Amino acid sequence: MDQLANHFKSHIAELNHRVAEIISRENLSGLVIHSGQPHRQFLDDMDYPFKVNPHFKAWLPILDNPHCWLLVNGRDKPQLIFYRPVDFWHKVADLPDAFWAEHVEIKLLTKADKVAELLPSDISQWAYIGEHLDVAEVLGFKTRNPDAVMSYLHYHRASKTQYELCCLRNANEIAVKGHLAAKNAFFNGGSEFEIQQEYLTATNQGENEVPYGNIVALNENAAILHYTKLESVRPESRHSFLIDAGANFFGYASDITRTYAFEKNIFSELIEAMDKMQQEIISMMRPGVKYVDLHIATHQKLAKILVDFDIASGEPQSLVDQGITNVFFPHGLGHMLGLQVHDMGGFLHDERGTHIAAPDAHPFLRCTRTLAANQVLTIEPGIYIIDSLLNELKQDSRKKQVNWQTVDLLRPFGGIRIEDNVIVHADQNENMTRDCGLN
């Protein structure tokens, strides 16, 4: 925690610098960042789990307290309007006394609808940053989530401060504990639901605290890219296990995937080949490299694996050009990682918000940035037996290049994905996931 405290001052200074720059350009007095407010379930008296505005938690690790506000102008000490009602129904947030509290001026808000009394008397030149535009309108904000401000902040969010890198390392360390527990639960015969519980216990995080819904998939369920059902019944046969699960630390996310074979067989050999390929792609990461080029290189390497394992036949580059590799690897190589699992700014190529879309041949790629120091990205190649995509391929001449016997052999295993979280440094890569002991 001492290391975080030491880095926090410079983190706030960097955020202040960014705000000062953009509000000067846009002739604004400052930004009013809303933590958010609860969403009530339809026809009920309960709220959905609260998720804080990522722009708010960029400044302060306050994740579970709605109706808070942050006033920043890049010059003065940030002002935190901290919601602390009189409430005998719910737990009221404690007064802030963590290491970060000395870096903000704190005002207490006891009634959410009285916040106007604590806002600047003239907010005509202040911009509201948040989800609840109706609230902003009632309060009199004329400028709400202006495009120029949002693009600027999202573009620069890709460059992580030392405080943020520390948070991301901690998020990886926590998640690795969960992954090791989940692996053990798989080999001990656990159901998907039981494996999930072991993961959550090891990370000491509830399902509403982890940054996304964990994917815990046994056997053919591993072919479903965003599988979150969690079967409670143990399968009769145990072939494979894919887990895509992260952890949260101070609002920063880890996002890690591993795949395991229950026995030594062609699938376990395929996992080894995919792991080797993933490490080769990570070794190619450096400032100045385009993420799109890494994605294309992954398809070229995957094509060779398809041939080596007699899943497909032909020249590897031809398999890429014909879109055959897309059938087995339909998603993107990865994405930016930070305050959000799919962090903002992956398509922005300047601070004005110039958008460069994914290539037409790879529409699901979530990042087209050129790599730079202090960026954090995931690298997550995969190979899957997805019947809906294979059925489309069967409708044309490409079907002759697929060995359907091998496909049938692999179908019960579902698929493979291996995902690490990597920091790009000026002269090296830092694989946080592997450094935390998950191989």
Curated annotation (Swiss-Prot):
Its EC number is 3.4.13.9. GO terms for biological process: proteolysis. Mn(2+) 2 binds at D244, D255, E419. Splits dipeptides with a prolyl residue in the C-terminal position. Its cofactor is Mn(2+). Belongs to the peptidase M24B family. Bacterial-type prolidase subfamily. It comes from the Bacteria. InterPro entries: Creatin/AminoP/Spt16_N, Creatinase/aminopeptidase-like, PepQ_N, Pept_M24, Peptidase_M24B_aminopep-P_CS, X-Pro_dipept-like, X_Pro_dipept. The keyword Hydrolase applies. It holds the Pfam family PepQ_N. Coiled coil: none annotated. It comes from Shewanella woodyi (strain ATCC 51908 / MS32). SUPFAM superfamilies: Creatinase/aminopeptidase (SSF55920). Keywords: Dipeptidase, Hydrolase, Manganese, Metal-binding, Metalloprotease, Protease. Mn(2+) 1 binds at D255, H335, E380, E419. It catalyses: Xaa-L-Pro dipeptide + H2O = an L-alpha-amino acid + L-proline. Binds 2 manganese ions per subunit. HAMAP family: X_Pro_dipeptid. CDD domains: Prolidase (cd01087). GO terms for molecular function: aminopeptidase activity; metal ion binding; metalloexopeptidase activity; phosphoric triester hydrolase activity; proline dipeptidase activity. The keyword Metal-binding applies. One of its GO terms (cellular component) is cytosol. Gene3D superfamilies: Creatinase/methionine aminopeptidase superfamily, Creatinase/prolidase N-terminal domain. This is Xaa-Pro dipeptidase.
